[in-house]
Amino acid sequence: MLNNKKDFSIIQEYSKALELLDNYDHQVVIKPEGLKKDTYQLTYEECRELIASMSFGASSTIFGREKSEGALKGIVDSVYQSAFGEDAYPTVEEKAANLLYFIVKDHPFIDGCKRIAASIFIYFLNQNNLLFRNGEKIISDSSLVAITLLLAESKPEEKEMMVKVVMNFLGW
């Protein structure tokens, strides 16, 4: 039975998460404030190097193999697209969340899409000096798994909401 301030304070420790869940339920998730302009541009070649370095590739001939030539390059290029001189995704958080979403949902590889998507996502965050705050990872291993699976299981019409959810994870 909840009968003291200590019990209530435990719940208060998760107030941001509970508020995000409530906003999701009501379909009113917003982009977090204080987003960072990107300083580092990811390349297709870097992504291929990263994939080649992953240990999963040693035990599989299909891990990281693109289903069609240029699929991953198209995804990487898409997060840097602009319209009327304005970036479609102007912040690191928007680029990172969309990069993760597109690789997971577009499924450009025969095998390893979620692992590759998560790896490129954290690599991109790290290159933009956003993966660690005060020496601590901003996304725990379990959170990385959860958001990657959340995106994988989401419906296409939920894209904008899912991207905003990921962006909120990055702002905490």
Regions found by a protein language model. Give the residues of each.
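FIC/Doc superfamily catalytic core
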Residues: 1-172
